[in-house]
A protein has these predicted regions:
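Bulky hydrophobic segments
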Residues: 1-92, 98, 102-119
């Protein structure tokens, strides 16, 4: 059962990463976007992706998950700087990614510390 769940979480995480890259490199959303503020979208996206990464790789150290997610966000920004994609790379986008990543890592640390406290 757990092995099937692990495979499912890894597959869902990989699929989500592909969708994020596809969206990040495709044409920019118009004014009808579900979340109108770009930075909120970045933070929310990386909040969800980081949570999915923790489920997909439960034995990976938190700092490694954070570094890998930051690298993923950085890679997206680098790719967006290539004129072929007609997108713009922004440090503020990467900072919003960090906020989303940090929020999940912070919750994971709080949960881990709470489990260590006596009942």
């Amino acid at each position: 059962m757990w092995k099937a769940a692990a495979i499912l979480f890894k597959g869902l995480f990989a699929a989500a990463c592909v969708v994020v890259v596809w969206q990040a490199l495709g044409p920019p959303d118009g004014p009808g976007s579900l979340i109108p503020w770009d930075k909120a979208l970045h933070g929310l996206t990386f909040f969800v992706l980081t949570g999915m990464a923790l489920l997909a790789f439960p034995k990976m150290k938190l700092w490694r998950v954070a570094v890998l997610m930051l690298a993923f966000g950085g890679l997206i920004e680098i790719l967006q700087s290539i004129p072929l994609f007609d997108r713009d790379a922004e440090w503020a986008d990467l900072l919003a990614d960090v906020v989303g990543i940090g929020a999940v890592i912070g919750v994971a640390i709080a949960v881990a510390l709470r489990r260590k406290l006596p009942a």
